[in-house]
C-alpha cells in the first residue's frame, strides 16, 4: 500500500517524503535518472506530452511494486489515466497550500526553476494552479493544510494516518 503525496510544485512533497522515508520515491528524480537530463531540458527538447508518458509509466511501475512513499510531480493529475490509477490508491495525501505562499516558495527556489513557472506569467501560473485544485481535492483521501506547519509536523501527521 502506497502513500502518495499530492500537490502543486512547491507544496513540500519532496521535503516531506524524505522525512517519512529516506528511500522514498521522488518521481521527478527517478525520471531525471531515466532520461539522463533535467526535466527542463527534456520539456524543451521533447515536449510535455513525451514527459507525461514517462511519468505515467513511472507511476504504474511504482504502484505495481507497492512503493511505500511516492512523491509525483504536481502535474501527475493532468492525465486522466493517472487520475484513474490514483483513485484506486487508498492513501492519497494532498499537501494543500495557498497560491501566494506557493508562488513565493517557487520564486525563491533558485536551484529548482521549473518549466511551468518559467514559461508562464504569474496570472497564467495561477490559472493552472486553480485548475488543478479541484482535481487534487477529488483524488485526495486526506488533505493537509501545510501553510504554517514545519515539514516535520506534516510528516508526523502523515505517519499517524
From Swiss-Prot:
The keyword Kinase applies. ATP binds at residues 10-15, 114. It catalyses: shikimate + ATP = 3-phosphoshikimate + ADP + H(+). The keyword ATP-binding applies. GO terms for biological process: amino acid biosynthetic process; aromatic amino acid family biosynthetic process; chorismate biosynthetic process. Keywords: Amino-acid biosynthesis, Aromatic amino acid biosynthesis, ATP-binding, Cytoplasm, Kinase, Magnesium, Metal-binding, Nucleotide-binding, Transferase. It is found in: Cytoplasm. Binds 1 Mg(2+) ion per subunit. One of its GO terms (molecular function) is magnesium ion binding. Pathway: Metabolic intermediate biosynthesis; chorismate biosynthesis; chorismate from D-erythrose 4-phosphate and phosphoenolpyruvate: step 5/7. Substrate binds at residues 28, 52, 74, 132. Its cofactor is Mg(2+). GO terms for cellular component: cytosol. It is an enzyme of class 2 (transferase). Mg(2+) binds at residue 14. CDD domains: SK (cd00464). Its EC number is 2.7.1.71. Pfam families: SKI (PF01202). Belongs to the shikimate kinase family. PANTHER family: SHIKIMATE KINASE, SHIKIMATE KINASE 1, CHLOROPLASTIC. Catalyzes the specific phosphorylation of the 3-hydroxyl group of shikimic acid using ATP as a cosubstrate. Monomer. This is Shikimate kinase.
Amino acid at each position: 500500500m502506497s502513500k502518495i503525496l499530492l500537490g502543486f510544485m512547491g507544496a513540500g512533497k519532496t521535503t516531506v517524503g524524505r522525512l517519512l522515508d529516506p528511500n522514498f520515491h521522488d518521481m521527478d528524480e527517478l525520471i531525471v535518472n531515466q532520461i539522463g537530463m533535467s526535466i527542463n531540458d527534456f520539456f524543451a527538447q521533447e515536449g510535455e506530452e513525451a514527459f507525461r508518458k514517462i511519468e505515467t509509466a513511472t507511476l504504474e511501475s511504482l504502484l505495481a511494486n507497492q512503493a511505500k512513499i511516492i512523491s509525483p510531480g504536481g502535474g501527475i493529475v493532468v492525465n486522466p489515466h493517472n487520475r484513474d490509477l490514483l483513485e484506486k490508491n487508498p492513501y492519497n495525501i494532498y499537501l494543500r497550500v495557498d497560491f501566494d505562499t506557493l508562488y513565493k516558495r517557487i520564486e525563491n527556489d533558485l536551484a529548482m526553476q521549473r518549466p511551468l513557472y518559467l514559461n508562464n506569467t504569474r496570472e497564467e501560473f495561477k490559472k493552472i494552479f486553480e485548475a488543478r485544485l479541484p482535481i487534487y481535492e477529488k483524488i485526495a483521501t486526506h488533505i493537509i493544510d501545510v501553510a504554517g506547519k514545519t515539514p516535520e509536523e506534516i510528516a508526523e501527521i502523515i505517519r499517524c494516518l
